[in-house]
Amino acid sequence: MSLQELSEQELFRRESLNKLRKLGIEPFPAQLYPVDALSKEIKDHYDEGKEVCLAGRIMGKRIMGKASFAEMQDSSGRIQLYFNRDEICPGEDKALYNEVFKKLLDLGDFIGINGTVFKTQVGEISVNVKTLRVLSKAIKPLPLPKTDAEGVIHDAFTDPESRYRQRYVDLVVNPNVKETFIKRSKIISSMRSFLNSKEYLEVETPILQSIPGGAAARPFVTHHNALDIPLYLRIANELYLKRLIVGGFDGVYEFAKDFRNEGMDRTHNPEFTQMEIYVAYKDYIWMMEFVEEMLETICMDVLGTTDVQIGENTVSFKRPFKRISMIDSIKEHTGIDIAPMNEIELRATCEKLGVETDESMGKGKLIDEIFGEKCEGNYIQPTFITDYPVEMSPLCKKHRDNPELTERFELMVNGKELANAYSELNDPIDQKERFEEQARLSEKGDDEAMFIDMDFVRSLEYGMPPTSGMGIGIDRLCMFLTNNSSIQEVLFFPQMRPEVKTIKLELTENEKAIHEELKKVNKCELQELRSSLEMSNKAWDKG
């Protein structure tokens, strides 16, 4: 970037940088700084006269002659600093105060201070600074909001695209964003502690795979130069974890980064985090109770309550959760019994219900589309949707009482899928036949049909005990427990379009209408707008 492209503020800060060096002060020192306290700790445990060593960013300055105040922000919060010229410059040379602090330090710069804790006349806990050291110079100004005399906030850093692209700035100037990610860390920590308390083993499985199995999704493709073969970023870790059950482990789990080369919207990112667990000698009924206990425990650990505010809804994660079969759910919300229908009849039913289809969709996909459009969004309180048709679940065991169904559930919360679980298919002959059916769907053009993994079939031929498996979306769980409506709010660095390119999106007329309406409304009105437009989950998310 040339000097001509710099703003007035950036030019001023670079000039200050050079002046610091001329004074013999290194703006980016290498040696450690011996921090021994945090602002929150000082405020929570006030100890007058205690000597402390702090470091952080300058977020505010009030210059008043020989004495001044500054606000410093560290990793735990903010605290007021008091600077007296003669205390930080006890000798004849007053340049550290008169030149460095007053003129050359800007908002956003990092400093280190030693001082003593005290309270001002108005009772604000502060630190009386004795020594000052420059730790890092910021040559771009932070977008700090300002509040005018009427209480109106100006220059707030609120544009979502800017916030997601420059999360490092977002975290500095918007404390609530930092709290969201601290809570995310606590959610994952609580889940891991719960799983470890059950003595299940945390494992790692390959991210680069020769066959991307375990889910119905489009993979990312890459190439291994040394082996001269195509490889795929995993879409799920299911098949590798089940191989470990074959190998003799009774319970394994993994927090996995998975990748799906599909659409992006408020609840989907191409790179996402899942936790998958497989436990031998269990079934999907046991797994429902396990999931209930786990989610209730996490809510109590992180929030101190099982009642969670998600948008306009108060959702209770108190056990037990409601249960309903998929066929009964479709019948409840459409009045149609799909149980006896073949593919032709299902296609006609989709047309009657206004559900979009294409020729590549088989029976299972058609049922999935009906449920997604007409039922899914109605389940606000945690609800297990159980007993899926066999065509929808190629890795799942057939139902013990009805071979047309499978022992599968999905947990719906706030109108979205949160978890998916099976009584796992461990019959290698049946598994091979299911894979072959997926191959036929792929030939019809279904790019979400599962890949055939014959090595996995071979592993089953050595024998896998009865097993229940479950996958839960960590990003979506974090959305729910932090009351965020967008997945981008719970990912530090969500996938974004390149800044240098302008890409025109092709939208339907309905989606264009949503886009135009969204320009006119505030975030708090989104749910009301969605209700008034009567759009399905899929059309709303894309729009």
Put a short name on every predicted segment.
Residues 1-504, 526:
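Class II aminoacyl-tRNA synthetase catalytic cores and aaRS-like
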Residues 535-543:
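Short amphipathic alpha-helical interaction segments
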Residues 528-531:
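A short acidic, leucine-rich amphipathic alpha-helix
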Residues 503-517:
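Short alpha-helical segments that sit at the start of domains
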Residues 519-525:
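Short capping segments at the starts of secondary-structure elements
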